Amino acid sequence: MSEKKLKITQVRSVIGSTKKQKATIKALGLGRPNYHVDKEDNPCLRGQIRVVQHLVKVEEQ
């Protein structure tokens, strides 16, 4: 029973972003460009990614 995993990499800085976008990056466990996290795919995570889609790169694993 393996769930899909997503590798989320922050590619841009949060300088100039809104408070909501900064909070979302922090909630994802990111903080600086080129940091990445591996998370299980779910609708909640997809919503967070949509908020900061211009700041991150997402790859399926």
Swiss-Prot record:
**Is Ribosomal protein included in the keywords of this UniProt record?**
yes
One biological process term in Gene Ontology: translation
What keyword terms does UniProt attach to this protein? Ribonucleoprotein, Ribosomal protein
- GO molecular function: any one? structural constituent of ribosome
Q: Supply the InterPro entries for this chain.
A: Ribo_uL30_ferredoxin-like_sf (IPR036919), Ribosomal_uL30_bac-type (IPR005996), Ribosomal_uL30_ferredoxin-like (IPR016082)
Q: Looking at the UniProt record for this protein, which Gene Ontology cellular component terms does it annotate, in alphabetical order?
A: cytosolic large ribosomal subunit
Q: Does the keyword Ribosomal protein apply?
A: yes
Q: Name one Pfam family in it.
A: Ribosomal_L30
Organism superkingdom = Bacteria
Assembly mode:
Part of the 50S ribosomal subunit.
Please name the NCBIfam families in this protein's record: rpmD_bact
* Family, per entry: Belongs to the universal ribosomal protein uL30 family.
Q: What is this protein called?
A: Large ribosomal subunit protein uL30
Q: From which source organism is this entry?
A: Chlorobium phaeobacteroides (strain DSM 266 / SMG 266 / 2430)
